Amino acid sequence: MGKNKEVIRLERESVIPVLKPRLIMTLANLIEHSSDRAEFLKLCKRVEYTIRAWYLLQFEDLMQLYSLFDPVHGAQKLEQQHLSSDEIQVLEQNFLSYLFQIMEKSNFKITSDEEVEIALSGQYLLNLPITVDNSKLDKVLLKKYFTAHPQPNLPDFVDKYVIFRRGIGIDRTTDFFFMEKVDMVIARFWAYLLRLMKLEKIFSRQPKRRPMEDSKKNDEATPDVDQDDLHVERIRLENMELSVRNMLGKTTIQEPTFDRIIVVYRRASTKSNPDRGIYVKHFKNIPMADMEIVLPEKKSPGLTPMDWVTFLVSAIVGLVAVVGSIEMPKADFWVIFAVLSTVIGYCAKTYFSFQQNLATYQNLITQSMYDKQLDSGRGTLLHLCDDVIQQEVKEVIISFFILMEQGKSTLADLDLRCEELIKEEFGERCNFEVDDAVQKLEKLGIVSRDTIGRYFCVGLKRANEIIGATTEELVLKARQGLNP
């Protein structure tokens, strides 16, 4: 679409983007002997049942704590407990500690200031400035948590709300974008005038770019740079090459998306009537440039100060031109008409453009509520708990399979081989968390280290004997006995 190529560089995700059933069956089919294949499938089930049992108590504590802070029914349950304010605050912090641990285990990351700046440095479908009404958000709960649990690169708004993100995708939209293209042409002309008048530094709305984003002026690939990072192209109208074909024809724009976003916050309240509800909202496939649609307690959008400045300057220039034309000895009616038409046309364009953007905003908000919001509260927490189990099981199975097939390995070699297996068999890339997987294997008792620190596993049959029959297996056998 244009000569400029804008690429966003992001850290590669740790989540394994392969469904567990597909992963297990693919690995099982790589095993030559049918008896070993059967033992491997049995081991996979026992690993999952055991890991699920490990997390059961922690998940139960999490859900019980959330029931006290559920925005819908939590207040009634808290009232029944007859707890003091200090006791409630302790329970709040315990809930957040459990929640943030689950987030980390599910490979969700807190969006940093840098990521937010990169995400919002462009425009996609949402072309209105969206801000949060901070007066409607609590500033105590999260601030207290992060004071006790400091983390690097936290965003400025973390005392009011936290945005977790996981997974990167691509969203494409094809349309004529007539109004947006007109806006783009006007913006370029306005930028040109500012450069002529040496005022671009005062009026420029472009945010400062950080090294995380690489804008390339050619299509040359750089395959040897940052192989471990994920590079995603952003195609925007702002970078479009001006031509009759581009202006009048359909255009495809492209924006990276956050595959999953979870927002945590609490609404503001008074001391006399405190609101203890904690909101946990879950969204999917949110374009980075439109990330504002997931913000809590949004203000109603309006014209920006820059829009008003542009509007007033244009009106003043037009009026000066009209007055100057009238005061001339031979006032030209058509000149006056042309100037007035231009000013009125620009004012009308500004108004209708704003109305169109407002309608788009309302449509996106509705879409985020019905199409892009997966769940909230208890449903989100249950989803997270299952995510943790699925991820841990996949990590353990892949690590054991590599040790079983390729023999002893150092931690670094095991990490590399696991990532290569995922890439070769499934065509996916991820930053494999080998440390966590090895810890689980050692805890299960089916992997050990030799005298020089290399990891090795026991045989499949022995691994099943060490783990032993799980409760789920005993229940299934009992059912089969009752239903011969």
Where are these predicted regions, by residue range?
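A short, conserved structural fragment
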Residues: 438-452
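Soluble catalytic regions of membrane-associated enzymes that act on cell-envelope
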Residues: 426-440
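Short alpha-helical segments that sit at the start of domains
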Residues: 365-408
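Transmembrane alpha-helical hairpins and terminal membrane-anchor modules
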Residues: 299-372
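Short acidic, hydrophobic short linear motifs in intrinsically disordered regions
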Residues: 407-425
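Basic, amphipathic N-terminal segments
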Residues: 2-304
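Short, amphipathic alpha-helical interaction segments positioned at domain boundaries
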Residues: 460-484
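Minor-groove-contacting beta-hairpin "wing" of winged helix-turn-helix DNA-binding domains
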Residues: 453-460
